[in-house]
Curated annotation (Swiss-Prot):
An example Gene Ontology CC term for this record: cytosolic large ribosomal subunit
Residues annotated as transmembrane: none
InterPro entries, A to Z: Ribosomal_bL17, Ribosomal_bL17_CS, Ribosomal_bL17_sf
PANTHER family in alphabetical order: LARGE RIBOSOMAL SUBUNIT PROTEIN BL17M, RIBOSOMAL PROTEIN L17
Subunit structure: Part of the 50S ribosomal subunit. Contacts protein L32.
GO BP annotations, alphabetical order: translation
Name this protein carries in UniProt: Large ribosomal subunit protein bL17
Pfam families: Ribosomal_L17
Length: 128
């Protein structure tokens, strides 16, 4: 029975899932907008939102925890120097998931994941 087992397996091993969401979180932090499948987008929330909450209080311990979860110095720098300050007054809900149709090859539902209140520039390309 699968009672109270949360999270999607996404047809991957646990190490593959962990690496995939780590990479997706770093891409989201760096680009602030990514395009992925809808189930991956919904699971990404569980990884990315706690990182932003962690970045709201800048300390050496929190930076080490964030680096342990992302393994990217540039992502940790942006988290604590930019995003932590941007969302200091927001009590969660840092991500927005927008459905954007279906993928051409396998008809998988696709979605954009973006940071709320991100500065909107000219033509911003989604990292894929």
């Amino acid at each position: 029975m699968r009672h109270r087992k949360s999270g999607r397996h996404l047809s991957r091993t646990s190490s593959h899932r962990k690496a995939m969401f780590q990479n997706m979180a770093v891409s989201l932090i760096e680009h602030e907008l990514i395009k992925t499948t809808l189930p991956k987008a919904k699971e990404l929330r569980r990884v990315a939102e706690p990182l932003i909450t962690l970045a709201k209080e800048d300390s050496v311990a929190n930076r080490r925890l964030a680096f342990d979860r992302t393994r990217s110095k540039s992502a940790v720098g942006k988290l604590f120097n930019d995003l932590g300050k941007r969302y200091a007054t927001r009590q969660g809900g840092y991500l927005r998931i927008l459905k954007c149709g279906f993928r051409a090859g396998d008809n998988a539902p696709m979605a954009y994941v973006e940071l709320v209140d991100r500065p909107v520039g000219g033509a911003v390309e989604a990292a894929e």
